Amino acid sequence: EKKKPNCKIMGIGTKNYGSCNGIIYKNRSSVDYFKQVAEIEDYGYILLNQQWKKAWGGDYIDLLTPAMTDQNHVRVFTDDNRYISQDCRHLTPAGAQWYAQILDWKNIFKEKQPRYQ
């Protein structure tokens, strides 16, 4: 099927919130529980995100970078202390709401410019 005129196709990035929420949950009694971050143990996620970002250019929705706190750590909790992901891969409703607040929707849905003229 052909793409409809004025239709915008976007690449949507990968996500990774550590290897197991149990690692975070076991520290639930600590004072800084909600400040914990998770390590991205598989660097392939970061490389894949970089490759897709380069390939898709302005038509890429990067979900990994906004969650990163440094080169290989990501947030686990939203600003209101709710889990972003229940299983380290899929978003909780709170995680989806967090992304809805932080992503630049005006930029994502701006009118598409032709790649080649």
Where on the chain are the PLM-derived regions?
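Extracellular glycan-modifying ectodomains
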Residues: 1-117
